[in-house]
Amino acid sequence: MKILSVLLLALIICSIVGWSEAQFTDVSCTTSKECWSVCQRLHNTSIGKCMNKKCRCYS
């Protein structure tokens, strides 16, 4: 049971750190494919996702 608690805590910490790497944009979108060129142009990365109708870029 202790190991499960430690693994759960590690997962939560890693998730929080991962979220901080996201960079938000004000560019509207309907599909994630639309964000790829936006992220490349604005943040020099092609990893992007459409969330809540806004592009979100990851490094």
UniProtKB/Swiss-Prot annotation:
Residues 48-55 are annotated as: Interaction with Ca(2+)-activated K(+) channels. Keywords: Antibiotic, Antimicrobial, Calcium-activated potassium channel impairing toxin, Disulfide bond, Fungicide, Ion channel impairing toxin, Neurotoxin, Potassium channel impairing toxin, Pyrrolidone carboxylic acid, Secreted, Signal, Toxin, Voltage-gated potassium channel impairing toxin. It comes from the Eukaryota. The modification Pyrrolidone carboxylic acid is found at Q23. One of its GO terms (biological process) is defense response to fungus. The record marks K49 as: Basic residue of the functional dyad. The record marks Y58 as: Aromatic residue of the functional dyad. Disulfide bonds join C29-C50, C35-C55, C39-C57. GO terms for molecular function: ion channel inhibitor activity; potassium channel regulator activity; toxin activity. Its main location: secreted. It is found in: Secreted. GO terms for cellular component: extracellular region. Residues 1-22 form the signal peptide. Pfam families: Toxin_2 (PF00451). Expressed by the venom gland. Belongs to the short scorpion toxin superfamily. Potassium channel inhibitor family. Alpha-KTx 01 subfamily. Potent selective inhibitor of high conductance (maxi-K), different medium and small conductance calcium-activated potassium channels (KCa1.1/KCNMA1 and others), as well as a voltage-dependent potassium channel (Kv1.3/KCNA3>Kv1.2/KCNA2>Kv1.6/KCNA3>>Shaker/Sh). It blocks channel activity by a simple bimolecular inhibition process. Has a pH-specific antimicrobial activity against bacteria (B.subtilis, E.coli and S.aureus) and the fungus C.albicans. Has the structural arrangement of an alpha-helix connected to a beta-sheet by disulfide bonds (CSalpha/beta). This is Potassium channel toxin alpha-KTx 1.12. It comes from Leiurus hebraeus.
